[in-house]
Amino acid sequence: MRLIIQPDYQSVSQWAAHYVAAKIKAANPTPEKPFVLGCPTGSSPLGMYKALIDLNKKGIVSFQNVVTFNMDEYVGLPKEHPESYYSFMWNNFFSHIDIKPENTNILNGNAADLDAECARYEEKIKSYGGIDLFMGGIGPDGHIAFNEPGSSLSSRTRQKTLTTDTIIANSRFFDNDINKVPKTSLTVGVGTVLSAREVMIIVNGHNKARALYHAVEGAITQMWTISALQMHEKGIIVCDDAATAELKVGTYRYFKDIEADHLDPQSLLK
C-alpha cells in the first residue's frame, strides 16, 4: 500500500486529479479499448473532480475514451432528485468534461428488479475487462461505498441497508432530516473494488483519522471495510495531515520519507 500525505485537502485533490489524469494518458485509451474508471460521490472527491475538470478544459487529459462505473446509488430516489448520485455526478463532473454520456454507468435504484440490476452491473464491468482504476472515499467508520461495518470483504454489487450512523451523516444533504434519507442503497461490493487493477482512496479531515488508522495500521476486518485495501497489490491512499492524527509517528515519517519524491502533483504528468 502507498500512503501519500499532503498538507491539506486542496493538495490532496490536486494530487489525486493529476494521478488519475496521468493514468488515463499513459493508457492511451481508444474507443475499442477505453480506460475504465470507478467513481465515488460525496464530499471527499469534489475537489478532485474540480481539478480534473480544469485539466480537461486545458487539454491536458481527455475523457472521450473513458468509461465510468459509479460506486453506489440510493434505492427509491428519482434520478432527477438533487441528492441522487446520478444528479451529483452530472452536476459536479460529467456535464463539465468531454465524456460521452453513453460511457457513464450508474446503478438504477428504481429498477423493477434490484437483484437483476446488480447482476447486470457486475456483468457490464466484466464486459469491459474490469476496472482500471477505482477511486473512492471513506466514511468515519471506514466504509467504502455503502459497504457498512460487517460487510463481507468478498462481496459484489448488491442491495444494502444503511446504518443509522450513515443515515445521520447523510442527512446534511437532506435538510438535516433523517426521515428524508433513503434507508437502502445499491452498492458495489468490497470484492468489486478489490478486483480493480488499482484502487485510490481519498481520506481527509480529523473525523477520518480513526478510519485511516484502521486502514493502514489495523487488522484486516469486515468491521472496517477500508482495511481490505491492505490486500490489494496496487492500493493508494491520498490523505491530508489532519487525517493522520491517529497514526504512529514512525508510520507517518516512514511514508513521508519513501514518497518524498512523488508528492508534487505536477511531476505525475511529466
UniProtKB/Swiss-Prot annotation:
InterPro entries membership: Glc/Gal-6P_isomerase, Glucosamine6P_isomerase, Glucosamine6P_isomerase_CS, NagB/RpiA_transferase-like
Enzyme Commission number: 3.5.99.6
Active site positions, chain numbering: 72 (proton acceptor), 141 (for ring-opening step), 143 (proton acceptor), 148 (for ring-opening step)
Single GO BP term: glucosamine catabolic process
Gene name linked to the record: nagB
Job description of the protein: Catalyzes the reversible isomerization-deamination of glucosamine 6-phosphate (GlcN6P) to form fructose 6-phosphate (Fru6P) and ammonium ion.
Family membership noted in the UniProt record: Belongs to the glucosamine/galactosamine-6-phosphate isomerase family. NagB subfamily.
High-level lineage: Bacteria, Pseudomonadati, Bacteroidota, Bacteroidia, Bacteroidales
Residues flagged as site, Part of the allosteric site: 151, 158, 160-161, 254
Pfam families: Glucosamine_iso
GO cellular component terms, A-Z: cytoplasm
Pathway: Amino-sugar metabolism; N-acetylneuraminate degradation; D-fructose 6-phosphate from N-acetylneuraminate: step 5/5
Protein known as: Glucosamine-6-phosphate deaminase
A single MF term (Gene Ontology): glucosamine-6-phosphate deaminase activity
Keyword terms of this UniProt record: Allosteric enzyme, Carbohydrate metabolism, Hydrolase
Mechanisms controlling activity: Allosterically activated by N-acetylglucosamine 6-phosphate (GlcNAc6P).
HAMAP family linked: GlcN6P_deamin
Catalytic reactions of this protein: alpha-D-glucosamine 6-phosphate + H2O = beta-D-fructose 6-phosphate + NH4(+)
